[in-house]
Amino acid sequence: MHFIYLILDAANNVQMTCTEMRAKMNIGLIAHDAKKILMQNFAIAYRGILSKHDIYATGTTGRLIEEVTNLNIHKYLAGHLGGEQQLASQIEHNQIDMVIFLRDPLSPKSHEPDVNNVIHLCDTYNIPFATNLATAELLIKALDRGDLEWREILKREGL
């Protein structure tokens, strides 16, 4: 978002300044057990960016991120207890702007339908979604540049 301010100088000449203010986004973070340390390291590396936004995470992942970053995390239940379903509900209501879900593709999960539902909903509602570190880094840097501000327009328009 850009804000333009008109300011009068001492000679009553109009001076125009433009400041940029990034929209605060709601970011969902989930990590399978084998990826939790990777998620912690990701959160440490990008703490400065994450601190400018509201972070939502499944229970254990959120607690682990809080421990290493001191960020305030809105925590759902643990993933296998319904946390992924809680995130899915927020996605359906257009309350999440981006999801980083560090998945372990080698270990099948008993709650795999919940995982697939999150993926399906992100695709349905055009929520930027990463399942690996490379894509997560691209998204977090795009977030920092303001490349995801189009999400705010969608929310305002009720889309």
What are these regions (language model features)?
Residues 134-159:
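Short, glycine-/small-residue-rich phosphate/pyrophosphate-handling segment
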Residues 21-54:
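Glycine-rich beta-alpha loop segments
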Residues 119-139:
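Short, acidic/small-residue loops that bind anionic groups at enzyme active sites
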Residues 54-55, 71-82, 150-153:
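Short hydrophobic/aromatic-enriched beta-strand-loop microsegments
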Residues 84-120:
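Mid-chain, well-packed structural core segment of small domains
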Residues 1-17:
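N-terminal amphipathic/basic-hydrophobic helices that include classical n-h-c signal peptides
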Residues 53-61:
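Short internal beta-strands
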